[in-house]
């Protein structure tokens, strides 16, 4: 069997923290070949290594070191030949730029929040709901496009929470109520991020806009697509009641969530049944065998003091969710602690796995 031809890809926001992670993950990817880099007008026309303030522990990949950076425009050199464009743009500029690329009939897989609530755009956590890609033909039809569309991945904390919630709904039916408190790493604020005087020896009990994202996104992700593949049902007929409190803690990478769950069914499952549901959970990314999918979607920790960001965030190359401290909840039914690598599965890795799945489904060529 002949090897799969690589698909040319571009990265928008290539010099930023998410863009750097995209480049690291794509530099030696079996499906994709880096072909175009986009950044601000200040960086345009220069070699990537000259304009980027590289913040990852690995070196700048040789494949991109001497690539010329262009402005984030669909008519800039290289982008028209790309089968997919990955966006690591900040939300304050992502909306118009991503829409321009889609309007130019290009495929965009975005880490930004701008189109997560769009009724035509899938909001996909690759370990949960790639079935939502079925709305893409309708998105194209509504916008008069042949190839172009936008897919977004979720907020980084939402991603870590909905994977275990999806396992619970798959095994035991609908959830009624979820309360979560997050302890979010400083890397989630980007670079330079939170002032050291604000975060050292401290916990900041507010991340602006974060709680609303978790509360809203959960139902779009865990819901389905209508039978005609033209809308998202947002977990109809009964949405999950979700209440989130989000805090920033002095951890570099790794978002932790403390989750309490009430099931719609009565009696609820036992702790042992919940633990088994987490261990047995598998997802479409694994079944399709895409290269960035984790061997385990959920890693269950038996030690009473795990998961911990320092020890567990890198499991399965940061592409899984860790779960531990599964126990009965005296207020609801079950409570547990979950952990996600916010800079990988919580960001660039999700977009890449989403695109890998789309390749297997014939939605990227």
Swiss-Prot record:
Mechanisms controlling activity: Inhibited by the competitive inhibitor 1,4-benzoquinone and derivates such as 2-chloro-3-methoxy-1,4-naphthoquinone, 2,3-dichloro-1,4-naphthoquinone, 2-chloro-1,4-naphthoquinone, 2-bromo-1,4-naphthoquinone and 2,3-dichloro-5,8-dihydroxy-1,4-naphthoquinone.
Main localisation: cytoplasm
Reactions that this protein is recorded to catalyse: L-aspartate 4-semialdehyde + phosphate + NADP(+) = 4-phospho-L-aspartate + NADPH + H(+)
GO BP of this protein: 'de novo' L-methionine biosynthetic process; homoserine biosynthetic process; lysine biosynthetic process via diaminopimelate; methionine biosynthetic process; threonine biosynthetic process
Residue pairs linked by disulfide bridges in the UniProt entry: none
Pfam families per UniProt: Semialdhyde_dh, Semialdhyde_dhC
Annotated family: Belongs to the aspartate-semialdehyde dehydrogenase family.
Complexes and interactors: Homotetramer; dimer of dimers.
Name this protein carries in UniProt: Aspartate-semialdehyde dehydrogenase
Originating species: Cryptococcus neoformans var. neoformans serotype D (strain JEC21 / ATCC MYA-565)
């Amino acid at each position: 069997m002949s090897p799969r031809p690589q698909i040319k890809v571009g990265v928008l926001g290539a010099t930023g923290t998410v863009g750097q992670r995209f480049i690291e993950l794509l530099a030696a990817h079996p499906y994709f070949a880096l072909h175009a880099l986009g950044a601000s007008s200040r960086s345009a026309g220069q070699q990537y290594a000259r304009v980027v303030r590289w913040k990852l522990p690995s070196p700048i990949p040789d494949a991109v070191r001497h690539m010329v950076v262009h402005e984030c425009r669909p008519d800039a050199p290289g982008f028209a030949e790309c089968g997919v464009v990955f966006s690591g743009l900040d939300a304050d500029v992502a909306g118009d730029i991503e829409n321009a690329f889609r309007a130019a009939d290009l495929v965009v897989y975005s880490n930004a929040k701008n189109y997560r609530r769009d009724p035509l755009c899938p909001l996909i956590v690759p370990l949960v709901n790639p079935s939502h890609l079925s709305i893409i033909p309708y998105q194209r039809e509504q916008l008069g496009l042949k190839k172009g569309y936008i897919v977004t991945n979720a907020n980084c904390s939402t991603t870590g929470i909905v994977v275990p919630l999806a396992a619970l709904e798959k095994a035991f039916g609908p959830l009624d109520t979820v309360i979560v408190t997050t302890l979010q790493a400083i890397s989630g604020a980007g670079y330079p991020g939170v002032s050291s005087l604000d975060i050292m020896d401290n916990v900041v009990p507010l991340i602006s806009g974060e709680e609303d994202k978790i509360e809203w996104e959960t139902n779009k992700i865990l819901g389905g697509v209508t039978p005609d593949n033209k809308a998202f049902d947002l977990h109809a007929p009964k949405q999950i009641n979700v209440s989130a409190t989000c805090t920033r803690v002095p951890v570099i990478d790794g978002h932790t969530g403390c989750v309490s769950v009430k099931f719609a069914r009565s009696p609820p499952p036992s702790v042992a049944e919940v633990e088994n549901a987490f261990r047995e959970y598998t997802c479409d990314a694994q079944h399709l065998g895409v290269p960035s999918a984790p061997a385990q979607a959920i890693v269950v920790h038996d030690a009473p003091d795990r998961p911990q960001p320092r020890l567990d965030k890198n499991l399965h190359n940061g592409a899984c969710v860790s779960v531990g401290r599964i126990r009965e909840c005296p207020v609801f039914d079950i409570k547990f602690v979950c952990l996600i690598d916010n800079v990988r599965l919580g960001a660039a890795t999700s977009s890449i796995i989403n695109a890998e799945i789309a390749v297997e489904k014939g939605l990227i060529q």
